[in-house]
Amino acid sequence: MNTPLSQVVIDDGRSYLERSSALYDVITIDPPPPVEAAGSSLLYSSEFYATVRQHLRAGGILQQWLPAGDSAVTSSVARALVESFPYVRAFNSLEGWGVHFLASMTPIPRLSATELAGKLPAPAARDLIEWGPGSTPQEQFEIVLSHELSVASLVDEDPNVPALQDDHPVNEYFILRRLSDPAYRQKVWRRLLGRSESL
C-alpha cells in the first residue's frame, strides 16, 4: 500500500463503486466469513457484478474469494458470475477454505507459473512466499494453478439453485435448507438429547 499508485478508501465497497466513476485493472473482493451473514449477499449478487463490470478497464479482472459453504451457495455465486461475465476461472483455496474466482469481460490469459512469478515485483514475491506452502514464487504459483476447478462443475453442484440476486440471497437462507434436510434435523435432535454430535 506504500506506493503513489495506491489510494486507500475506507468505505462500503459496493456503495463506493456505485458513487464512483473510477475504472480499475483489478477489483479484489475478500469478504470475511461467514458467507451466510446478513447482508453479505450484496457482495456476491448479479446486481453487484453488474456494478463491478462498469468499473473494470478493458482487460480488467475481478478476483473474489468465496468462503467454503454449502453446495447451494457455491452454485448460486458461480452461476451469478457466469451469467455476469463471459470469462470465469476458479481455484480451490490452498487450505480448502473456499474458492477463488477470476472473472473478466475478456479472455483471462493462461500464464505459466514461471510467467506469473516473473511479473512480481520483489516485495510482492517476498509476501507471496511468506504465506507458503511454496518456498519460491514459482512453486507457489504451481500449487495454485494445480488447484483449478471446473466452473461448470461448481454451477452444477446444485443445478436447481438460481443465480444469487439482491432480492434472492440464497446464502442467507441457509437455515431453511438445513432444517429441510432430514440428516441435519437428526443431528440437531441428537445434540438436544445429549448425544453430542457436532452440527
Where are these regions (language model features)?
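Soluble small-group transferase modules, centered on the S-adenosyl donor enzyme superfamily
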Residues: 1-4, 12-21, 40, 85-199
